Amino acid sequence: MALQFTGPFAPMCEQFVAERREAGRDYSQQEKILRMFDNFSKDYAVEPFVVSEELAQAWSQKRPNETDINRYNRVMEMQRFSKYLVEQGYPSFLTGIRLSKHYTHTPYIFTEDEIRRIFQIADSLETCASVPLRHQVMPVLLRVLYGCGLRISEALELRVANVDLSNGLLHIRHGKNGRERLVPMSESLTQRCQIYMQNVLDGKEPDAFFFCSRLNQPYSRSGVGKSFRGLLWDAGIPYLGKERGPSIHDLRHTFVCHRLNQWASNEVDLTAMLPILSKYLGHTSISATSWYLRLTAEAYPGIVHKMDCFTKDVFPVSWEENDIE
């Protein structure tokens, strides 16, 4: 469902989002930021469709407990919108603030035992009146995230028609930056999804969300995060806070590291496999995937000597959320 814009920039926001989507971009997360900006603008004296310097500077201020990457995304979305307004003939302010999008947090790589414990606890979830589908959604969602290395946004945007259970394929229609790809599932995961389809989605239309709420809306990212933190607690895995995790997105990182560790242990040619893995993950470049070589070597020191020839040139000081997410 499209978001409603009610602030002083509402018509231009709707036009801006529509043009981005016509160009093939999903724009869901950016639309949410733009709606926040439009609402934020209600407290300022705004000339028709003009982002003033005062408004731009106020929006760009770092908020309490806000991460650098979230602030970066907020400010850059305002910048893109302001530039668009200028192109439409409205003299909007373009801030010269330069922000770093580098994120130095090291992802948490779950051990295989921790993954088993998380799955076992998810499988034992009881029904809950406030979230009646949680006990059915979470066990399958977590297995899809770990088994296929999907981004959480990609999983939650899956429609029934995007899940090909006959061939064991997931059709990611709106990956990062609007990219599409097909993601194969294992036989066991396909069977799990078939059971879920029969129990939860029987009779649903093809455009229904695969991971849906009781209101037939996509299961919310915040709801998934809250449930996941509860599972971590029950599994005896310390949750160190928003900045340090573990987070639901670490299941994607763990999928990659476990796969690379398996290949390295079996002496598979990583040079040949990295391009395939890169396509599977939806990365735009092999360099984004190569970063995982370092992370895998750190998580599994015993295979470092097998990866030396691959990791010697891919040890950046920090990594970009924009590339690795």
Regions found by a protein language model. Give the residues of each.
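Conserved catalytic core of the tyrosine transesterase superfamily
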Residues: 1-325
